[in-house]
């Protein structure tokens, strides 16, 4: 066999091996549920969560005022954090319930639970999501708003925001998932 044929055979075998490896990874039944990044959906049971955007909210900023309806000024050294999320119930025949709470956790293990919100953009933890429904609901203020997602509201201290990456913990039907949020 001449060297040109040997090289072609080698390249072909290498491509077959790489393709087989890629296909084997696609067949994995256990989806990764840790270290998800914003914009990457994660399925927990029939509910698919997608964290779109995270940012500190300023109570004195006109743009943020609708997200912070009814909230007092934050204590010195603390800030409000808005985590904007979309959720899809992929079940064709069954409603599913959202977790009753969500948490932000910094690298030192400090935990911050979402706080109640009166905002029209707020996600309501513990709510039922109908079969094949979306949160936020189609044509709702949150869905047609600037971010097009429902908001989870948190209050964090400034020190914890520096302990990155901060993760959103979602305790769903199939156990927890963690999403690295961009603060």
Region spans (language model):
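Sec-dependent bacterial lipoprotein signal peptides
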Residues: 1-24
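Conserved functional micro-motifs across diverse proteins
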Residues: 21, 25-183
């Amino acid at each position: 066999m001449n060297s040109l044929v040997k090289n072609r055979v080698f390249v072909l075998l290498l491509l077959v091996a790489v393709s087989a490896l890629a296909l084997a990874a696609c067949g994995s039944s256990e989806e990764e549920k840790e270290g998800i990044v914003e914009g990457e959906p994660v399925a927990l049971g029939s509910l698919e969560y997608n964290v779109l955007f995270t940012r500190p909210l300023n109570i004195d900023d006109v743009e943020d005022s609708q997200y912070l309806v009814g909230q007092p000024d934050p204590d010195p050294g603390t800030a409000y954090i808005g985590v904007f999320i979309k959720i899809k119930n992929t079940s064709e025949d069954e409603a599913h319930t959202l977790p009753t709470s969500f948490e932000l956790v910094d690298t030192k293990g400090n935990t911050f639970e979402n706080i109640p919100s009166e905002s029209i953009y707020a996600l309501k933890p513990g709510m039922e999501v109908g079969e094949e429904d979306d949160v936020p609901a189609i044509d709702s203020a949150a869905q047609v708003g600037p971010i097009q997602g429902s908001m989870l509201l948190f209050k964090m201290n400034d020190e914890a925001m520096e302990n990155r990456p901060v993760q959103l913990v979602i305790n769903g039907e199939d156990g927890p998932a963690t999403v690295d949020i961009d603060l």
